[in-house]
Amino acid sequence: MQIKVDIREHTLIKLLNALNNDYGFNFDISVERLDLGDISIWNEGEELLLLERKSLNDLASSITDGRYAEQSYRLNGHSLHNHNIVYLIEGNISTFSGKWSKIKPGTLYTTMFSIQYFKGFSMIRTFDITETAEYILRVCDKLSRSSEKFGFYHESFQPKKKNYAQVVHAEKKKNITPENIGGIILSQIPGISSK
């Protein structure tokens, strides 16, 4: 896995390198000027995820000065499916004062809703830049260990065919219907699978 980080992300670069070492990961972290986004995650020469990192103050400022609309427009034109473009929003809205901008917490909530619902981007909230760095590394760890390398919207994605009896837990009694009860009962017998 390769993590490409924009050269302007000085603190994040230091944290990623430190945590990469502390956790015993061996991800290739490179620093370069990214035309779009702040972090790009690659595997074997293919870009998997593009992440746009924003503190609440950054988000508020970008709404005020128009960068938010321009940036989301450019992200929408990226070759990755919007679901694989992730806004990482750092901070606690409950303690956001917005004293440096005219943006109120309610506007931040509706903007985050818009990012997901109307624009189709993914969004993750983190407490601070340290949690952001850990999140990025944990995502890379999961992707590197996963047998399914392709995300849902990737052209090579093949969904696994499972029937209900393969995924139901015995305690989910309210999910039992006359149509699936036979498979569920049989799958409870040792040595018998639902296949």
Regions found by a protein language model. Give the residues of each.
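Short N-terminal binding/cap micro-motifs at the start of the first secondary-structure element
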Residues: 10-16
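Structural motif
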Residues: 4-9
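Short, surface-exposed basic-aromatic patches at helix termini and helix-loop junctions that form
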Residues: 21
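Extended, alpha-helix-rich binding/interface surfaces that flank or overlap catalytic cores
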Residues: 1-2, 16-18, 28-188
